[in-house]
């Protein structure tokens, strides 16, 4: 759409973006791990919201920062790299390109409204009787 991107705060805050296939691969490896453990999954390389919008190419609208919002969040992936030999394969920039390349596939995707969810749920439950 031609709507501007809404950026909370100044856009300099950084987040850890991870492409879905990298997350799926990490979950697969963790599910085959024979010990009980906790792993962080991410890129370990946070990117600013302004940089994301620059890659998306669009106008920006800034709104005030929310109270308590952290400036930087990212995953420490040291343990998952060491124990599962996992690391992300898709760079942030490549991931954004992949999403943009397939974005038109989502234009005709059905939207789930509360009414549609209620109807679908009712339909599902009739098969359980």
Please place each PLM-identified region on the residue numbering.
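An acidic site on a long C-lobe helix of protein kinase domains
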Residues: 16-23, 48, 91-92
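Alpha-helical substrate-binding/gating segment
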Residues: 1-5, 17-39
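Phosphate/oxyanion-binding loops and surfaces in catalytic or ligand/nucleic-acid-binding neighborhoods
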Residues: 1-5, 30-33, 55, 59, ...
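C-terminal "lid/loop" region of Rossmann-like NAD(P)-dependent oxidoreductases
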Residues: 10, 38-39, 47-53, 58-78, ...
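Non-catalytic, hydrophobic alpha-helical segments
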Residues: 23, 27, 41, 52, ...
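Amphipathic terminal alpha-helices
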Residues: 92-129
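Glycine-rich "substrate-gating" loop/helix at the edge of Rossmann-like oxidoreductase active sites
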Residues: 3, 9-20, 45, 67, ...
């Amino acid at each position: 759409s031609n709507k501007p991107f809404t950026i909370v705060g100044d856009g300099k805050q950084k987040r850890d973006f991870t492409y879905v296939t990298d997350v799926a691969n990490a979950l697969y490896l963790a599910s085959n791990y024979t010990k009980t453990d906790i792993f962080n999954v991410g890129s370990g390389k946070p990117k600013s919201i302004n940089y994301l919008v620059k890659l998306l190419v669009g106008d920006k609208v800034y709104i005030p920062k929310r109270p308590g919002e952290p400036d930087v969040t990212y995953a420490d992936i040291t343990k998952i790299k060491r124990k599962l030999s996992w690391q992300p394969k898709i760079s942030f920039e490549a991931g954004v390109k992949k999403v943009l390349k397939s974005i038109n596939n989502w234009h005709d995707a059905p939207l789930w409204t509360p009414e549609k969810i209620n109807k679908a749920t009712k339909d599902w439950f009739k098969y359980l009787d």
